[in-house]
């Protein structure tokens, strides 16, 4: 996707001219969008709206640092984003009350365990026994996401 800022809070999104994939090729597929940080969610919502024109099965948004404002949480609660995958790099991400309705579509990965595993491997230590629920933090067991896709 190609992004052009037309103002402080205005963004135009379109398929990049050099993209090897057209919107039509997305039909029935899972689409994953990556970003480093989200605040207001305006850009990612516009991007996902454009992608939804291709009729994908679902759109998954992966973001390293989920630091969203109230406006951002409202924007991303819309139906254009089916699931949000993020890391626990910011303490507020684990506060269910702060995330509101988004927790129904959110998966949080524990980055400290990934770092620990890499460092243990790097320094030649065996991985040893680790917690069974190694990567995910269940934001809401009452609202499981994508049961069919997760097995």
Segments from the language model and where they lie:
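PRPP-associated nucleotide enzymes
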Residues: 1-151
């Amino acid at each position: 996707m190609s992004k052009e800022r037309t103002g402080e809070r205005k963004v135009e999104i379109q398929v990049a001219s050099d993209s090897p994939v057209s919107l039509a090729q997305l039909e029935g597929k899972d689409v994953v969008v990556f970003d480093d940080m989200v605040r207001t969610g305006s850009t990612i919502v516009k991007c996902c709206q454009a992608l939804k024109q291709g009729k994908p099965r679902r759109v998954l948004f992966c973001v390293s640092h989920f630091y969203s404002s109230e406006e951002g949480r409202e924007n991303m609660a819309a139906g254009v984003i089916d699931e949000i995958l993020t890391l626990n790099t910011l303490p507020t991400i684990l506060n269910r009350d702060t995330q509101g309705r988004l927790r129904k579509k959110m998966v949080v990965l524990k980055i400290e365990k990934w770092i620990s595993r890499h460092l243990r491997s790097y320094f030649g230590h065996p991985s040893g026994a680790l917690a069974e629920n190694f990567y995910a933090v269940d934001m809401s067991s009452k609202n499981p996401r994508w049961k069919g896709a997760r097995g």
